[in-house]
Amino acid sequence: MNKRKHMDIRRLIISLPAIMALWGGLASCDKMIYDNYDDCPRGVYVNFYSQTECAENPSYPAEVARLNVYAFDKDGILRSANVFEDVQLSAAKEWLIPLEKDGLYTIFAWGNIDDHYNIGEIKIGETTKQQVLMRLKQDGKWATNIDGTTLWYATSPVVELKNMEDGADQYIHTRANLREYTNRVTVSVDSLPHPENYEIKLASSNGSYRFDGTVAKADSTYYPGETKVVGDSTCRAFFTTLKLESGHENTLSVTHKPTGREIFRTDLVGAILSSQYAQNINLRCINDFDIRLVAHHCNCPDDTYVVVQIWINGWLIHSYEIEL
């Protein structure tokens, strides 16, 4: 009896290396197990980080909690679509994007797409990277309120899955830089005798995005932002917007409510870029804008006020001469 037990244990010990070798072969697509590599699972591991041109080191934003990740081939056709929940970015963490075939791929990723957005139809093997991925929800001309949320976008360098028959790796690794696609904009108007009579608005045609992070053509949409009186001669409004960039009608306006007359209207991004101090306000590095407009009484037909100075993040970017 004991002799048989010893024999069974010995057989088990002898067979363990064989079992481990078999498991390792299955896990790594060993040629000893597979006749070829056609059924071998493959893919790209992606590490996500965030770093602007102005930052010395990468960061790993804690507010990124969800990732929608897409892989497109060299022809711009979608080959893999994945959603990862409860994300926690770190230098060591990677996410696997499964792929079936050898070839060149680019990874596009969006962080924090939620129920504020409508997602377009997605079909593996048909959808192109130039198609619209999502649209910010809106009611008429007003966008849904995205205060307290952030949106992020990343793209990887082109990566290549090579033929494993030639000794290539089963999986490859890359990184993708998440850039924030939301802005927080505080606008104050000073030197108004009756600040309760004025309304601040901010609109942009940036509510739709393609898979590749570019803005799709859309009508201008107003972002919610209540104008409040914050002093004897000051009113203020706060807005959370999607990415403000040149060419998309980023219109900031101030209206005198009793008459309906606009006392100020400008393309916000255009005003920044046309300023001699534009180099101090790098739109690639800044997501928070503190805008101060200084008003002055003018010799106008309706005896009202106009804006004579524009300050952004402490910089006087424009001043205007008026007839007093």
Curated annotation (Swiss-Prot):
Covalent lipidation (S-diacylglycerol cysteine), chain numbering: 29
Which InterPro entries does the entry mention?
FimB/Mfa2/Mfa3
Q: How does it sit in the membrane?
A: Lipid-anchor
What follows loss of this gene? Minor fimbriae are longer than normal and are easily detached from the cell by mild shear stress.
UniProt-reported outcome of changing residue 29 to A: Loss of palmitoylation. Abolishes export to the outer membrane
Describe its partners and assembly state: Mfa2 is not part of the fimbrium itself, but anchors the fimbrium in the outer membrane via its interaction with Mfa1. Linear, head-to-tail oligomerization of fimbrial subunits mediates assembly of the fimbrium stalk, while the minor components Mfa3, Mfa4 and Mfa5 probably form the fimbrium tip. The anchoring subunit Mfa2 limits fimbrium length and is important for solid fimbrium attachment to the outer membrane. In its absence, the minor fimbriae become very long and are easily detached from the membrane.
Q: What is the protein named?
A: Minor fimbrium anchoring subunit Mfa2
Native source species: Porphyromonas gingivalis (strain ATCC 33277 / DSM 20709 / CIP 103683 / JCM 12257 / NCTC 11834 / 2561)
Q: Which gene encodes it?
A: mfa2
